[in-house]
Amino acid sequence: FSSLGEGVKGKRAVSWRLVDETVPLSRFATRVAERAKALASLSPEKTGPGVVLAPLDGRYSDDGVEHRHVSLKIDAEARVAHLTMRAPEGAEPQTATAMRQRGSELWALRAFRELDDVLLDLRFNRPEIGVVVLETQGDAARVLAADAALWSERADWFVNEVLQHMKRVLKRLDLTARSLLAVIDRGSCFAGSLLELALAADRSYMLDAEGGPTLATSQLNLGALPMSNGLTRLGTRFLGEPERARIPAGETYDAAAALTAGLVTFAPDEIDWDDEVRLALEERASLSPDAL
């Protein structure tokens, strides 16, 4: 294609998959309208009132950003930012009607709006930060329950919009031009939709200790939140090894199992934990954020 000065037309463009189809000029406008209507019909019918997105009212300073479910703490001297996402504080609605009544305060909507806001703050206001440490806090069971409700009610237009928003925000995380390190310590809740943060990271460190953290999968890890390439983060991680990407929903992994399954990069024990994480942060922070 690059060597043809005259370009590619018609049937050859279709056969080379450069375009979907060719249409005569006499039918062009009609065919475009038909395709547009067909695509529009794939969206769930919207019934009932919409949802007003209330302001997030985050607190911004030179030291970071503080939201209800997401916080960003800046260590300017070390050129490291700690991004922490928290699980729901209580039980989340289980039906589409109840979710719509909760509106913009629904955890899956508000928390990911806050994550989007923090990622944009990093992009535009923190150019010297080279490393972002991804952390989570809270009860993993509440995250999994929220995921399960979203999945079971996904046919509802509002729930579908929430899932689409989560997908877009996670794509922004994928495309964030900083080194991303997930730190999976005690008290973490990398489960379901929040497990995607660890899967999006360039490196992940999980503490291997008695009573240590665990990872857990939900239905949302299996295709509801794809990357920009159309694949899941698991599918991208195991490109060329599709059988390894077929991890069932509802599985729980300790550090050893997560390392064997390829879900984390490193699993230091308590003796090496502090030093390994510190050295990793110092190594990455020593490199230019622009180069990364």
Positions of PLM-derived features:
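Glycine-rich phosphate/ribose-binding loops and adjacent secondary-structure elements
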Residues: 181, 222-237
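Short acidic/His/Gly/Ser-rich catalytic and metal-binding motifs that mark active-site loops
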Residues: 91-95, 140-146, 216, 224-226
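A structural preference for short, pocket-lining loop segments at secondary-structure junctions
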Residues: 80-83, 108-157, 161-186, 207-212
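Conserved aromatic-histidine-acidic binding/catalytic patches
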Residues: 20, 103, 107, 154, ...
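Amphipathic alpha-helical segments at domain termini/boundaries
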Residues: 1-103, 121, 125-128, 135, ...
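Glycine-rich, flexible loop segments associated with nucleotide phosphate handling
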Residues: 104-111, 213-216, 253
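Glycine-rich beta-to-alpha active-site loop
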Residues: 1, 6-7, 137, 170-223, ...
